[in-house]
Amino acid sequence: MKELEDILRKLDEIKYGWIDINGEVHLNTMKDFRKIYKTMSIETVLDRKIGICMEQVFLTHILLDQLDIPNKMFCTRIYEDENFNDLDAHEHMHCFSLCYIGDFVYHIEHANQEERGIYKYSSEEEAISKINAFYEALDKGRARPVTEFFDVPEGLTFKDFNLYINSLGEYNK
């Protein structure tokens, strides 16, 4: 699919990284992420050519929308409730998008560079199951709820984004 390949090439311009609350750039590291990360606007992502999975998936969503390709954004993570406050804990979250063309579902993966590519599935359920199983295996089999989300508001901390995802309910366990 040429359109999806074009989107993947556009995403290749974006490095995996984030800008902290002090304006410092962090590339390929999650050190102090829970303490000083805030979500960026799409304008900042495009201008600075940097973003983590949340921003990259939101950019993918916008690009797919511009092409009138139906799509959804999802988050797989180890559940953390509103009282979780371990700012040194490892992040167990990954956002991904699915798009729907003809009778197939496609997953454009860019943020996880080891899995970079375009994946084709016969259904949304198959796609979510396989993607989630990959991340559950990385977390030694720990269950990860998957939740559809609709926006990546600018300025959210990691905890705020997690609480936003929690507020949407679970799609699948």
Could you say what each language-model-derived stretch is?
Residues 22-23, 33, 84, 103, ...:
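Intrinsic-disorder/low-complexity loop/linker signature
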Residues 48, 79, 158-159:
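Phosphate/dinucleotide-binding and metal-coordinating scaffold of catalytic cores
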Residues 48-49, 102:
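A generic hydrophobic-helix recognition signal that picks specific residues
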